[in-house]
Amino acid sequence: MKVLFINSVCGIGSTGRICTDLAQQLEAEGNEVKIAYGRKGTVPEQFQKYAVRIGTDFDCKMHAIQTRLFDTHGFGSKHATKEFLKWAEEYKPDLVWLHNLHGYYINVEMLFDWIKKHPEMQVKWTLHDCWAFTGHCSHFTMVKCEQWKSHCSYCSQLRRYPACFAMSSVSKNFERKRKAFTGVKNMTLITPSKWLADLTRQSFLKEYPVEVHYNTIDTSIFKPTPSDFRERYGLQDKIIVLGVANVWEDRKGLFDFYKLAEMLDDRYVIVLVGLSEKQIKELPKNIKGIQRTNSPQELTAIYTAADVFVNPSVEENFGMTPVEAQACGTPSIVYEDTACEEIARQNGNTVVPQDVNALYESITGHKFAGGVTNKCTIICIPRTNSPQELAAIYTAADVFANPTYEDNYPTVNLEAQACGTRVITYDTGGCRETIDGKTCEYLTKTK
C-alpha cells in the first residue's frame, strides 16, 4: 500500500515527529510511505527518504503575506499546490493521511478538490487543533467563543495565529472551509483527545466518524537519563519546576509561569524550554529560559533533572510532555477541564483547578526527594530543536509547569512525565487528558 502523509513539517516538532513515527511503523509493515511537507526546516537525515517538499520558502512567505493582508490562510500557495498535486497524481497513494494543513504552505480547496476526484483513496485526517472548523483561529476556549458551531462572522483573535492585520475574511473563510472539507467519501477523522473529538462532533465536520488515538512516546528514548544539566546551569541545590512548549504564549500558560515565579521562594527555579531569544531576554531573573530543541535525547536529560513538570495550558489537545516527563521519572501537574487531564489521570499525575494559586499550592506541597531548602530560580533557556537536550532539561527539573490556556493536546506534558518530572497544568483544552491526578495535577483556570 502507498501512503501519503501531508503535514506542515517533517521529522521536527510534535506533529512532524508523529508523522515520521507513523511512517516508520507503516514502512515496517511493508508499506511505501512519503511525507509531503511545506514549512522551512531541516528534515533529520533518517527521515529524508520520506520527505517531499511542497513549494519553496518563497511560496510560504507569499502565503503568509496574503494572510496578513487578506485573512486568506489556507487559500494561497496555488502554484505550489498545483505542482504538488501533479506529483501526487503520479504517486497514486492508496491512503492519504492529513495532519496540519495550516502553516502557509498548501491550498486546501485545491487539495480537497483533488481528494474528492479520487473516491477510491482512503483518507484520514488527524486534527491537532480546531483550525479546520473555524473562520480564522486554531483555538477558541480562552475567549469563550462558540460561533464555530454554526457560522463564524467575527473573530476577536484576528491578530493571533494565523494573524491578519488588515481585511477580515472570517465569514467567507468559514464557508469556504465548510464547502471544501465536507462531502469527502471514505474519510475518517482522528483526534488525540476526547476533548477535541467532542468539539469536532459539534462542528460542520460531524458527518465524519471520529476516532480518538492518544499520542504515544518512545520509551526507549524517554526514560530516566542522568546528565550534567543541573551543573551546567548552576541548579544543583534548586527544586526545578519545568515547563516545555514548541511556542510559548499566553494560552500555553506563559503568564501563569510569570505569576508563579513571583510566588515561589528562593528554593525553586522555573525552567522553560521552547522560548524565543526575545522572550528569554525579557524573562524575570528567577526564570531560566532554553530555546526549543528537536532532540528527544536532550529533552530526556532535562525531564530527568527536573523535580516536577507543570503544564498550565488551557487549550492543549493532548500534550505529550507530561507523559514523557513521567517516563523519565518526573511527576507532572496539569489543569483540570483540559485534554491534558485525560492522560494525566491515566498515568498517576496531579490534576488541579485552573488557578495559579492551586498550581503554587500543589508545587510547594510536594515532597521532593532531595529535601532541597535553598534558593529557587525559575529557569528559561533559549529554544532548542534537540529532543535530547529537551529530555535532559525535563529530567533535571523539579516541576514542569504548563500554564497554557488553549493547547489541543500538549505533548510537553507527556514528555516531562516520560522523563520522570512532575507536571502542573491548567484543566483547559486537551491538558486534562494528559494528567491522571496521581503524581501530576491540573488546576482550574480562573481570571
Residue ranges: model-predicted function:
Residues N349-V356, G365-K367, G437-K447:
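Conserved acidic donor-binding segment of nucleotide-sugar-dependent glycosyltransferases
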Residues D198-R201, I217-R232, K281, F368:
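Acidic anion/phosphate-binding donor-loop and adjacent secondary structure
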Residues V314, Y405:
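Aromatic "clamp/platform" in nucleotide-sugar-dependent glycosyltransferases that forms part
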Residues G274-Q297, G371-T384:
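Nucleotide-activated donor-binding/catalytic signature segment of Leloir-type glycosyltransferases, i.e.
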Residues Q147-L189, Q202-F204:
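Membrane-proximal helix-turn-helix segments that form the acceptor-binding/catalytic region
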Residues P331-V334, N413, R422-T425:
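Short hydrophobic beta-strand element within catalytic cores of glycosyltransferases
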Residues I302-A306, I393-A397:
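Short alpha-helical donor nucleotide-sugar binding micro-motif in glycosyltransferases
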Residues G234-K252, Y258-E262:
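Conserved donor-binding/catalytic core segment of Leloir-type glycosyltransferases
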